[in-house]
Amino acid sequence: SKVLNAPEKQFIMCVKDPFHKLIPFWQIQIYADKIGYKDFYADLMEHLRNQPHKGAGNASIHNMYEYIKLCCDFLKTDLTDFFDAWGFFQTGKFHVGDYGNYDFEVTPKMIEETKHYIASKNYPKPSMDVTKLAD
C-alpha cells in the first residue's frame, strides 16, 4: 500500500486517495472473517448506534478512537500495531475535507488513553500480519 510504504507516516484521515483510506477498514473485515466473526461490522455498527457518540463536528475525532477500542473488544485482539501502522496514532492538528470540513486535534493523551485501554484488556496480538490481508 502507498500508505504503509510511504517514507513518512501520514494520519489516516488525511490520506488523499479514498480507496487507500478504506484499506484498513476492509482489512479488519477480512481479519474478522478469518477468525470466524462473520457479523463483525453488523455487530459493531449496532453497538455504535445504541451508544452516545463521543463527539460531533471537530470533536468527532473521538469516535475514531472509540472505533479502535471496539474493534479490539469485539475481535478480542490487540490491534494496536495494525492501527499504528496505518497512521491512526499520529498526533497533531489536521484539516480533513471528507464529507465536510473538520479541524481535528489528536493529542498524545488521546493516543495514550486508547493504547492503555487496549493493553489493559490483555488481548493477544493477531496470529497474522493484518496489514498484509487482501481479498
Language-model-detected regions and their locations in the chain:
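Structural helix-adjacent loops and short alpha-helical linkers that scaffold large soluble proteins
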Residues: 29-42, 72-84
